């Protein structure tokens, strides 16, 4: 399991193919069904009082979870998609965001930050962020139609896209899009300090021996989680 360099009261991790979660997590929550959208569900005392079935219904079609509760681990599942884990020591929140290319295109990270501002009065300059393992620009080859969707959505394509020889047919060039940088730019555009952003820099497509990759037709998923705890984690 990959764990991140965080303060002792914050536990953040991404699982590998070697095994599951090996940190102490008194309560672990993840969306019942991720749909590459932008919805966030708040994990609060009211949510915890629901039955397991009601919780599953509430988190169906959700791609981000946020909480300010201690010892509650919010998670998202990925396999080439980009996980973004957030925390704020001022408002005591943690947040887990599933940013696939479609969610990135819809600016899910920006949407989640707006939810944090509305629900918890979070100030973006107090946020810390981890961009976890996901497909890199070298491996994320896309067609012209995907490139055009990002361009029409107002993204800075000069900084996010480049052409490489085709991965299957090197006689033609194909667009590649940098989803790590795209999500980093969304964070900074909302006011997150660049110094507070960590990029894991792990390409799941290249390192499919250690991390699950949907483009490699791997069936498994990486669990990416974050929680606030009164006690340092124990691996």
What do these predicted ranges mean?
Residues 1-235:
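Active-site microenvironment for binding and transforming phosphate-containing groups
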